[in-house]
Curated annotation (Swiss-Prot):
UniProt keyword annotations, A-Z: Cytoplasm, Methyltransferase, rRNA processing, S-adenosyl-L-methionine, Transferase
Family statement drawn from the similarity comment of this UniProt entry: Belongs to the methyltransferase superfamily. RNA methyltransferase RsmG family.
Compartments, as annotated in UniProt: Cytoplasm
Protein role: Specifically methylates the N7 position of a guanine in 16S rRNA.
UniProt name for this protein: Ribosomal RNA small subunit methyltransferase G
Any one cellular-component term (Gene Ontology): cytosol
Enzyme class: transferase
UniProt key word S-adenosyl-L-methionine: yes
Protein EC: 2.1.1.-
HAMAP family hit by this protein: 16SrRNA_methyltr_G
GO molecular function: rRNA (guanine-N7-)-methyltransferase activity
Residue numbers binding S-adenosyl-L-methionine: 78, 83, 129-130, 148
């Protein structure tokens, strides 16, 4: 997917990008490739692949109608090189984006990236989701939490749902169908008061299958969740 294909596809979906937004995506690509030689950000560095498998893939929840251009508080867990939240932010500047990542070098990259792209209302924090999930400044504060290929739902639910307001939504982006994952996550979702409200499949322009699972938080998360760092992965609910 060339940048021109990317812009044309967005326009066909009703999103006509301004020159500034196109420049932001171009700068994003250049910085991603440059920094990838210093720290491991991505295995995908070929331009057309980045536009398809990172940029287009990241904004799919918007193109599929699951996110609006409103000043909502969005948290991205394990965003790595900023996916999916920063491409979403470029497309929808009204979003207030927070990223938590466990690797400080990635936070350094994201901080520089946001400055170079001129993004406002973006916040980056170094640490583990399990620790921030018990912090009152973060717990129960977000309208949306996004996670792209972070962990299976049984683990992911404990890392994300505590951050949501009641009625807030987890948007999980997956490369594989989530049916089996959701079956395994039933107990975790029950304990965390999360309800699956959508399990959506779609295709990238090249025909690759992708999946979005949306979970809504129904009640306040019990205080004991998330458990200490590492436990959700070692002993899933």
């Amino acid at each position: 997917m060339t940048p021109q294909d990317f812009y044309r596809t967005l326009e066909e979906d009703g999103f006509s990008l301004a020159s500034k937004q196109k420049e932001q995506f171009d700068t994003y690509f250049k910085l991603l490739v440059e920094w990838n030689t210093k720290i491991n950000l991505t295995a995908i560095t070929e331009k057309n692949e980045v536009y398809l498998k990172h940029f287009y893939d990241s904004i799919a929840p918007i193109l599929q109608g699951f996110l609006a251009n409103e000043p909502i508080k969005l948290l991205d867990i394990g965003a790595g090189a900023g996916f999916p939240s920063l491409p979403m932010k470029i497309l929808f500047p009204n979003l207030e984006v927070t990223i938590i990542d466990s690797l400080n070098k990635r936070i350094s990259f994201l901080t520089l990236l946001a400055q170079e792209l001129g993004l406002e209302n973006v916040h980056f924090f170094h640490g583990r989701a399990e620790d921030f999930g018990q912090d009152k400044a973060f717990r129960g504060q977000f309208d949306v939490v996004t996670a792209r290929a972070v962990a299976r739902m049984q683990v992911l639910s404990e890392l994300t749902i505590p951050f949501l307001k009641i009625g807030g939504k987890l948007i999980a982006l997956k490369a594989q169908a989530a049916d089996q994952e959701l079956e395994e996550a039933k107990n975790a979702l029950c304990l965390l008061f999360g309800k699956v409200i959508k399990n959506h499949s779609y295709q990238l322009p090249n025909g690759d299958s992708r999946f979005i699972t949306i979970v809504e938080k129904k009640k306040e998360t019990p205080n004991k969740y998330p458990r200490k760092a590492g436990l959700p992965n070692k002993k899933p609910l």
